[in-house]
Amino acid sequence: MSERIVLHIGAMKTGTTFLQTTLERNSALLSEAGVDFTGNRFAYQTRAVSAALKGAGEKGRRYRRWRRLARAARQSEQDVSLVSMEFLSFAEDPQIRQLLKPLRGLQVDIVMTVRDQFLVAPAQWQTHCRNNGTSDWGTYLRQIEPRLAGRPRRNDAYRTFHRAQDVDRTLQRWATFRRVGDVHVITVPGRDAPQDELWKRFFDVVGVTPPPVDFGVAAPNTSLGYGSCDLLRRLNEHLGDVSGGRYRKGMRQLAREVLAQRRDLESRPVLDRRGAEYARGLNEQLRESITRNGYVLHGSLDDLPVPASLEEYDAKPVPVPELETRAAAEAAWDYLTDRAGAKGGKRPTSLDALVLEDARLLREVHGWS
């Protein structure tokens, strides 16, 4: 039976999808290496964690799925059980206490993957655009800065960014519990690193030789270009009444089947100098936190750069090229008119009218009244 469980608690936008997909699709190889990816499915772990973190409902019922997961981990014939679910980083003290209870008797180690904040901010803006957000890139950069977030009520962009990326606070919350053993931090290697480097670092934490897997089957998050993200946030201005689950299903389909195909045709949002100063400061805070608290580091602090000069960054954010947004909106219109069986219509000429028509077609195709 397992005597140790490793909880990979995030953070978001740090290679979690790559790791989770690879773990799930190679669960048999993991078993041969002495590792149990508990439940063998990421969806199983997601449901257990999501139910436990819900604010409403009777406490015992909320944690029922998590207790089942804990029981499965205990009963595993492997040496180590492994759970990877970034929503665990959202848990507050009372929730962490409840999550740890059924793991009593197991060695519980925590691991968090962290990434260069110069890359995280654009990735988080994309998440903002794909989840009802309406802020353009330049506005978003200012909104996530604490000094301009507003008091006493901070904006949604600020809340979601810092909820996902406040690594120091997250690790300190978990580390204060006596049932937590070692706390590990993995720095995500740079873009030029070998494809398997993050995998190797992850299995340094697990404590076994990483099994040889086919990374070709791993499914990283489908990233979008600048114009497509701008289209989504413009569409969101007309879809604020669509409920979360229905919204996500329809918009993910549009992103996957249409907008992701345009990625190589579009530019990327780039930090301005002030945004770069903020990212540099966040990297510096991460480095200090890892060193100060004595977390077990896998990788290098150099993966969290603190450049002396930021002269390469423009004074103001580079706006999205309107032609990119228009081309993305036209591609969406072609796709949606085909889905709606409305071929032969005339495409609107102005960008605002085209976005409005795309929003109307989304409602028609998905039954969003």
Task: Identify what each model region corresponds to.
Residues 1-369:
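Anion-recognition interface
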